[in-house]
């Protein structure tokens, strides 16, 4: 879901606007990736507004946690100590992992009763 990527950028920006430094911004990004990276896209529709709401509220929450130096560490799923590797892990899921998922979602949507 594109909301995950957009909201992660928002979390970084919110943290910066709150006076956060580079380290705290990486904390916010890690919080976002640990929290909503599993959100899937199931087609553009009114339900997307719900996902945007989840992304925005999670971005704000992640920024607040980051400013308190509370963040998901490398014991949490796809999060690694290095922020670049963490982002690459999310990218791998979006690029490689979602190909089969997209086909499955489309199959479910086209075979509803």
Which sequence ranges carry the predicted segments?
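Functionally critical mobile loop/hinge segments
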Residues: 7, 14-113
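FAD-binding core of FAD-dependent oxidoreductases
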Residues: 1-11
């Amino acid at each position: 879901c594109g909301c995950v990527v957009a909201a992660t950028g928002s979390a970084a920006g919110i943290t910066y606007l709150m006076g956060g430094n580079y380290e705290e911004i990486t904390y916010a990004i890690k919080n976002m990736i640990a929290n909503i990276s599993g959100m899937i896209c199931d087609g553009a529709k009114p339900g997307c507004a719900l996902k945007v709401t989840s992304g925005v509220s999670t971005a704000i929450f992640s920024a607040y946690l980051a400013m308190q130096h509370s963040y998901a560490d490398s014991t949490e799923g796809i999060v690694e100590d290095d922020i670049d590797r963490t982002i690459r892990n999310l990218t791998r899921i979006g690029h490689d992992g979602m190909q089969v998922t997209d086909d499955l979602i489309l199959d479910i949507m086209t075979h509803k009763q």
